[in-house]
A protein has these predicted regions:
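Glycine-rich, small/acidic residue-mixed loop/short-helix segments
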Residues: 25-35, 40-42, 245-266, 270-279, ...
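Intrinsically disordered, low-complexity N-terminal segments that are enriched in acidic
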Residues: 1-104
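Secondary-structure boundary elements
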Residues: 98-180, 188, 260-262, 277, ...
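Short low-complexity stretches enriched in small and charged residues
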Residues: 1, 28-39, 155-158, 183-187, ...
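Glycine-rich, flexible loop/turn motifs
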Residues: 50, 54, 106, 166, ...
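Hydrophobic/aromatic-rich core segments of domains that either
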Residues: 152, 184-276
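Generic structural "secondary-structure junction" signal
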Residues: 15, 19, 26-28, 44-46, ...
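Long, hydrophobic, amphipathic alpha-helical segments used as structural scaffolds
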Residues: 86-89, 162, 193, 197-200
Length: 294
């Protein structure tokens, strides 16, 4: 699938900010065998006093910006054309949890893609006894079957509610509520798998939404999204699952970044020199591109 993606993040401040410094993670990367970025651009208004681009430890695209002059708003616009072609899942040859731990012990690398980075508790996805007990009900004959079942159960057992949680909500709190959004469901799945000894990480990106039959597609109605990557052994490697929708990641999922939890891939983090609050808005368009045949 070929997509044109447009993202607009806007923050309006109650009082003018005298300065600020931020890190922005919204630019999709090229990922071998998954997606290819054909073109991309990122702009800011007002223009920052300083700007630099780099890759973080996990290989995510980061733009660092700083402002020295007073400003009462920040407007961020990203556009990209991305081709997505995820491989079809093959025959499940992943080991069971016991053998997975043996394979994990044999991994000596601490490179960014090493499963060891995704096994311990993290800020948003701590190891929690209640979540581990819930996840144990999905433990199957293989790592993949365990992940599939847990993904489907979270989709079935939890209610999507955009008012129930915030970006600061931890997996244990969302689990108690039995409601939340994609970030919460991903953190719950990550915490549950880690509790079973299965490495799992957080993926941020975009998801194309399809309007109801007969309804027009609305501008800005698509969304930034979150899902889960799971290490399923030496031969199977990393697989991705979307517990919000009870499915594997598909060609409608466009990756922006990945990490241990939301805090590693938040779209924007930083500090402001100001005395008031702020209001943020987000608009996303994920538009399929149909190329005319020659």
């Amino acid at each position: 699938m070929l997509y044109d993606i447009r993202l607009n993040l806007r923050y309006d401040y109650d009082a003018a900010a005298g300065g600020g410094r931020h890190q922005v993670r919204v630019m999709p990367p090229t990922i071998s065998g998954v997606q290819r970025v054909i073109a991309a651009s990122l702009s800011f208004a007002p223009a920052p006093s300083e700007r630099s681009d780099f890759s973080d430890f996990f290989g995510n695209n980061v733009t660092s910006i700083a402002f020295r002059d007073a400003h009462d708003a920040l407007d961020i616009r990203m556009s990209a054309r991305v081709a997505v072609s995820r491989p079809e899942p093959g025959l499940d040859v992943s080991p069971d949890i016991r053998r997975l731990r043996e394979e994990l012990d044999a991994v000596r690398s601490l490179s960014p893609g090493s499963p060891h980075h995704f096994l311990a508790a993290s800020d948003h996805a701590g190891i929690d006894a209640a979540i581990t007990a819930y996840a144990r009900g999905s433990a199957g004959s293989s790592a993949v079957s365990t992940a599939v079942d847990l993904c489907n159960r979270i989709h079935r057992d939890f209610t999507y509610d955009g008012e129930a949680t915030t970006v600061q909500t931890r997996a244990s709190d969302a689990f108690d509520l039995r409601r939340g959004v994609c970030q919460d469901f991903s953190h719950i799945m990550i915490a549950g798998l880690r509790g079973l000894g299965i490495p799992a990480g957080y993926v941020s990106g975009f998801l194309r939404t399809i309007p109801p039959r007969g309804k027009p597609r609305l501008e800005g109605a698509d969304a930034m999204h979150a899902w889960v990557k799971v290490w399923c052994g030496r031969d199977t490697g990393w697989q991705e699952f979307d517990p919000t929708n009870g499915m594997r990641a598909s060609n409608d999922h466009i990756t922006v970044g990945h990490g241990r939890d939301y805090s590693d891939v938040a779209p924007i983090v930083g500090v402001l020199k100001t005395t008031g609050g702020q209001v943020g808005e987000q608009a996303v368009d994920v538009i399929p591109v149909v190329l005319e045949k020659a």
